Amino acid sequence: MEDSQLYQALKNYPKLQDTLDSIENLEDDTKSEPSECGSPTERGIPSYYLAEELDECEEEDSEEDDDNLPTEIPDPPTVDMLEAIMEDEIDDTAYQVHFEAKQTWKPVIETGGNERGKFTLSVPQNLSALQLLQWETGIHALAERLGGCRLLQISTRGTRDGIEFTVRETPCVSPASDPIPSTSRSSSIASNVSTRQTESPGSKSNTSLGIPEAPANLIDMGAIDKEFILAAISPSDPPYKNTLRNLFGSGDSFEQYNQTGIYSLKELVIAGLKRKGIYNRIRIRCHLEPQFN
């Protein structure tokens, strides 16, 4: 009964038959379309089948590559083999490389050879440009100050290795016109010792240069081994005693310094004390008026 009523209600629904027909046609079209979910169709091959064929191709390619590889792997080249290859490719005679030997640093280098009083003060290592300039300026200034001494004449010259010093001794203020032979000085009596005669302020030589004449009284060569005494300033201190040979170190040094023979005994003693490095100590303690025993 209920089915008949439902049927009557649906039957009375407008265009019901057309709607049912369209639904049936839609179902037929859906069944006739090809499946795209992996079923065999005329348009292509399923994806899973393609994946299997791709794997097989890769395996075949890898097998072909393995066939092309050598059956035995050679050993790596040794050091001897590499050296042999390098010797064949490079000509050692075409290249000449010279390395300077590393020398140890020395503070003073003798550069004069047979010439005395010539040496080079080496440049200190690891100096900056400013430090090197200050070092050179200080050394030149010191040499200029020392060069003003009566007994020495110092000249400096900058070189690649350092500063070259040339030291010359100046035994006299002005050379004598006629040097006295050493034989005449050695033949004099040792006890005949006198000091230089003083000149008046207005007395000068007749030469055009106006240089004072050399004193006539000279120190005898025989006095070099005679002991002299410098009296102490303080009565409690002992006097200073020595000889000219000991002050100058040897008879040759004294002979070289006193070539002209124009120095007085006092000047010779002062020069000897300076050579020995005790001048300042002695002049504070003693009177610089030597007397022979």
UniProtKB/Swiss-Prot annotation:
Keyword line: Chaperone, Host cytoplasm, Phosphoprotein, Viral RNA replication, Virion
Binding partners and assembly: Homodimer. Interacts with the L polymerase; the association of P and L forms the polymerase complex and positions P optimally for encapsidation of newly synthesized genomes with the nucleoprotein. Interacts (via N-terminus) with N(0). Interacts (via C-terminus) with N in ribonucleocapsid (via C-terminus); this interaction allows to package the L polymerase in the virion and positions the polymerase on the template, since P acts as a bridge between N and L.
Site (Interaction with the Nucleoprotein-RNA): K274
Biased segments, Polar residues type: 197-209
Annotated stretches, region: Interaction with N(0): 1-55
Protein name: Phosphoprotein
Family per record: Belongs to the vesiculovirus protein P family.
Protein's gene: P
Effect of N258T: In strain: Isolate CIN0327M
UniProt GO cellular component terms: host cell cytoplasm; virion component
Modified residues (Phosphotyrosine): Y13
